[in-house]
């Protein structure tokens, strides 16, 4: 699972900030399949990212959306997130791995549903 999640972590560390800049610093969830340019593809991937984040579970037991937004995008430490939920450090690490896995699965489903090709694979 760690290797599988490495691709998602790298996506949020390296690609997501670049996509945000390419989008003109706008958060969008609009898919435009008519724009076949490379920028259009990246715009759609960025929209897919936010569609996926909005579909993530966000309950006290599985705060996946909170973990992805706060840790992967806003760079809040897992320790600070864990303190919010009054749990131990291992709880946070386990939830983070589950959140990354859930993100990858839902992201692939969203890409197929919205016909955004080629599929982005997290290795």
Show where each model-derived region lies.
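Short, locally clustered residues in the helix-turn-helix/winged-helix DNA-binding domain
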Residues: 54, 69-73, 104
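Short amphipathic alpha helix immediately N-terminal
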Residues: 59-77
